[in-house]
């Protein structure tokens, strides 16, 4: 809650006061308005962000955002749509929703978490109820892991106490110190209450490059077999992805109890992007900047990117991550 914004809204509700009104009368009137204002959450939420959904999550709106903004990720789109909409429609979930998004840089993991946040809170990632942790920024020193565990537990407990529908996003899980993330295990388990706080309506999203090699191997096998990437099913890689991440010493999930105790609801693979997907990213970026689509520029930017494997050159090295800066060069030309 932003007190200044709420107070300003209150003052707007109070009629202009003529000079004849005594200060005490004005104070009583304002107190009455305050009492009534606070008594009606719906009225309050017209002027300040509230915990929970300001509006009911629209499955159709979420699907539209995923279809229009996330390219080449049929598996991720399906899992996110069903998992998030299903979880939010359940009035009494047994545990928090936990999604672990895996794939190379630039494939859309951060963008997907942004879409989820924006469809739950109007403020999106800037909402008071959405919390982003970046491993290299917030947990840089291995020697402080005990301190980080205590701080992480306190932060999550405090924020869920204030808002049951809090969203926590952990970026760079592949760079997080092993064992640190296990500090939040009690909050993800099947407990109704932990230290007088219920975490069952919270959402935890983990982003990682770990397991990207396994995802690429499956995608490349399908390509070499002449199959469409859309034929890849979640069952083709989810279990192998979980095992790969669990056994990866460079992953924050290395031998993690979150995986061992099956507390991650979905391991979501983000496939490496092909040339056609880069063109989609460039086209949408041009539209968002107010430019007309220019196929010549779109092709030039896409051709600037590098691809792998070295022989076949099927997948983009950096996904869509750097196409935006490449686009700047051609738009200014």
From Swiss-Prot:
Topology within the bilayer: Peripheral membrane protein
Q: What is its main location?
A: endoplasmic reticulum
Q: Which InterPro entries match?
A: P-loop_NTPase, TOR1A_C, Torsin, Torsin_1/2
As its record notes, the protein acts as a catalyst of: ATP + H2O = ADP + phosphate + H(+)
User: What is the annotated role of this protein in its UniProt record?
Assistant: Protein with chaperone functions important for the control of protein folding, processing, stability and localization as well as for the reduction of misfolded protein aggregates. Involved in the regulation of synaptic vesicle recycling, controls STON2 protein stability in collaboration with the COP9 signalosome complex (CSN). In the nucleus, may link the cytoskeleton with the nuclear envelope, this mechanism seems to be crucial for the control of nuclear polarity, cell movement and, specifically in neurons, nuclear envelope integrity.
Q: Which keywords belong to this entry?
A: Cell projection, Cytoplasmic vesicle, Endoplasmic reticulum, Glycoprotein, Hydrolase, Membrane, Nucleus, Signal, Synapse
The entry's protein name is: Torsin-1A
Fill in the subunit field for this protein.
Homohexamer. Interacts with TOR1B; the interaction may be specific of neural tissues. Interacts (ATP-bound) with TOR1AIP1 and TOR1AIP2; the interactions induce ATPase activity. Interacts with KLHL14; preferentially when ATP-free. Interacts with KLC1 (via TPR repeats); the interaction associates TOR1A with the kinesin oligomeric complex. Interacts with COPS4; the interaction associates TOR1A with the CSN complex. Interacts with SNAPIN; the interaction is direct and associates SNAPIN with the CSN complex. Interacts with STON2.
Specify where the region named Interaction with SYNE3 lies, as residue ranges.
Answer: 313-333
Organism field: Rattus norvegicus (Rat)
Report the subcellular localization: Endoplasmic reticulum lumen; Nucleus inner membrane; Cell projection, Growth cone; Cytoplasmic vesicle membrane
Q: Which cysteines are joined by disulfide bonds?
A: none
Under Enzyme Commission nomenclature, its number is: 3.6.4.-
Its family? Belongs to the ClpA/ClpB family. Torsin subfamily.
Task: Report which gene this protein is encoded by.
Answer: Tor1a
Q: Where is this region: Interaction with KLC1?
A: 252-333
**Keyword Transport, does the record have it?**
no
**Which GO MF terms does the UniProt record name?**
ATP binding; ATP hydrolysis activity; ATP-dependent protein folding chaperone; cytoskeletal protein binding; identical protein binding; kinesin binding; misfolded protein binding
Residues annotated as glycosylated: 144, 159
Top-tier EC class: hydrolase
Q: Which is a GO BP term held by this UniProt record?
A: chaperone cofactor-dependent protein refolding
The record ties this protein, via Pfam families, to: TOR1A_C, Torsin
Q: How is it modified after translation?
A: N-glycosylated.
Which residues does the annotated region (Interaction with SNAPIN) include? 92-252
Membrane spanning stretches: none
């Amino acid at each position: 809650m932003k007190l200044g914004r709420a107070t300003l809204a209150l003052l707007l509700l109070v009629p202009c006061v003529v000079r004849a009104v005594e200060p005490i009368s004005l104070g009583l009137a304002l107190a009455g308005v305050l009492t009534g204002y606070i008594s009606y959450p719906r009225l309050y939420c017209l002027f300040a962000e509230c915990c929970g959904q300001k509006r009911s999550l629209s499955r159709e709106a979420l699907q539209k955002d995923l279809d229009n903004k996330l390219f080449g990720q049929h598996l991720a789109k399906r899992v996110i749509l069903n998992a998030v909409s299903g979880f939010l429609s359940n009035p009494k979930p047994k545990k928090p929703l936990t999604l672990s998004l895996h794939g190379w840089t630039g494939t859309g993991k951060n963008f997907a978490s942004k879409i989820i946040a924006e469809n739950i809170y109007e403020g999106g990632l800037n909402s008071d109820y959405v919390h982003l942790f970046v491993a290299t920024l917030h947990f840089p020193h291995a020697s402080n892991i005990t301190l980080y565990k205590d701080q992480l537990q306190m932060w999550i407990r405090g924020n869920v106490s204030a808002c049951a529908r809090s969203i926590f996003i952990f970026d760079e899980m592949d760079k997080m110190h092993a064992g640190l993330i296990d500090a939040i295990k009690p909050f993800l388990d099947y407990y109704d209450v932990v230290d007088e706080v219920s975490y069952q309506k919270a959402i935890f999203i983990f982003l990682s490059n770990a397991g990207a090699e396994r995802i690429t191997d499956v995608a490349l096998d399908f390509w070499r077999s002449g199959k469409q990437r859309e034929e890849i099913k979640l069952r083709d890689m989810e279990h192998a992805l979980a095992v790969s991440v669990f056994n990866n010493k460079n992953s924050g999930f290395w031998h993690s109890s979150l995986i061992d105790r099956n507390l991650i609801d979905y391991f979501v693979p983000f496939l490496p992007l092909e040339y056609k997907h880069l063109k989609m990213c460039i086209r949408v970026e041009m539209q968002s900047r107010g430019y007309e689509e220019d196929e010549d520029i779109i092709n030039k930017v896409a051709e600037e990117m590098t691809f792998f494997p070295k022989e076949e050159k099927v997948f983009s090295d950096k996904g869509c991550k750097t196409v935006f800066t490449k686009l700047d060069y051609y738009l200014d030309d």
